[in-house]
Amino acid sequence: QGEKIELRSSGIINAATAMAVLRAAVGFMTFLLAFEFRGGEEGVPMEGTGRASGVATGLIRDQDILGTPGAPVWHYGAVLACASGGALLGARMAPRLRMLMVEERIISGVLFIAFAGTVSASWLPSISGAMVVSLLLAGSAGSAKLAFDSLVQRDAPDANHGRSFALFEGRFQLSWAFGSLIALLIAMLPIQVGYFTMALGVGLGLVFYLPRTREARKAQKIITPEEPQKPDGQLGFWTRSTEEEN
């Protein structure tokens, strides 16, 4: 019973909602860019014997005899490289940010970065916008996940963390699937519409999260334990002082 109460605290629920928004945005981005840079269709073969008849048959059947060019292969490589780099950067920066600020600030900060990235992508050329949004969104989602895990351990110290993380991760995966479904529904629209939709969703998540964590985001000192506080010799969880930083 105590575990359920801890896991249903407002801080954890609000952070889980923000994390679900970011995961949905990642799923949306994945399918949006997959459709944007998909390959083209081959036209009617026009070489060798029967070239003229093949072209004529294609015209009669109202087929595209020339085909539609797909995105260059290096576009995929550039977007994937940015997404991978963003994920690595987020995993690298989150522990360092945790030493400087509380988890609520990290989550709100990466929400803002993801929102700014999706808005700016709509004004950039296709490949440049895709690279920017994949880099910033992957990094934001990675940092937010580590901050969320830390927040759960901080606010629910007596909970079964393995089971709790598995439960939340399952919900986040459903959010990812929901985001990808939305991308499928608007796949035939211009990619700028997709960026606008993504920015709208992340922006709503930011508007939801900020007012509900105003008190928790106040500047407070991070107290790092230096002596073992557990029977197995492990250090205790980082806590926050009630004194504000100057």
Residue ranges of model-derived segments:
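Intracellular juxtamembrane helix-capping segments at the cytosolic ends
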Residues: 33, 143-156
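Juxtamembrane intracellular "pre-TM" segments in multi-pass secondary transporters
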Residues: 1-24, 226-245
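Helix-to-loop junctions at the C-terminal end of transmembrane segments
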Residues: 88-103, 187
